[in-house]
Amino acid sequence: MQTYTGIIKTPLDAIILFEACRIGLLPRVQRRLSDHERSLIRAGSVFVWDEREAGMRRWTDGKSWSASRVSGSFLTYREMEGKRKPYHHGLSTDGSLKRSPSADTTGNSSLNAYSNEDSGAASLSDEESVDDENLRGLHYKPNGLIKQSFSITTSLNHKLHLISYSSPIPDPSLVTPSSDVNLSRITIPYGLYPDAGPPLVQAPKFLAPYDILVEKVACSEDARVLDKLRQALWL
């Protein structure tokens, strides 16, 4: 069920995996994970799913997570020890009205929630905010996982989600999709991922460094230009 093993650092990394799944190079998640599959989640585990294809909007991994934090285009969570208390709408024990999910600047419901069974991807709007009472007794898990979520809607109205797991201690054996030689030939179709914005996809074809033929370099000046171009493409 796992889509990829590696590290996701940028939206481009996520989009490369979306495209690899679209063309059949990598598998998409088709259903919720079983208990056994949840137990196999490790640093480097990456999961991609199509909301309509898998029939699910929210990710289920059975772990407890901290409040979400916005990190660029991603939402980031830290693994917690223990389980949060169930959240209920309506009146609290003293008869006062319980706090309902608050709207964030994007118009989605607040994603700052401790997520036990369901932790959503960045585009989801049905996460529940949690009262301070529910946060008591929860602590960051020593050497616990870090989870990132990323979502995008394609021009064909496919809602795609990505969940990745990493460790606070970097693993040098894990690479990003954008630096993975096995994915270096993937091209991003122009206009398919409009939410990615102009900085990510500006031309009909994503130019990988391997598309540049070294044997066509005519002189040392050309070589210097080529090196600069390659460095820019890897950023």
UniProtKB/Swiss-Prot annotation:
Residues 102-118 have a biased composition (Polar residues). GO terms for biological process: meiotic cell cycle; negative regulation of conjugation with cellular fusion; signal transduction. Keywords: Cell cycle, Meiosis. InterPro entries: Gti1/Pac2. GO terms for cellular component: cytosol; mitotic spindle pole body; nucleus. Pfam families: Gti1_Pac2. Residues 85-128 are annotated as: Disordered. To yeast YEL007w and to the N-terminal of S.pombe gti1. Controls the onset of sexual development, by inhibiting the expression of ste11, in a pathway that is independent of the cAMP cascade. This is cAMP-independent regulatory protein pac2. It comes from Schizosaccharomyces pombe (strain 972 / ATCC 24843) (Fission yeast). The gene is pac2.
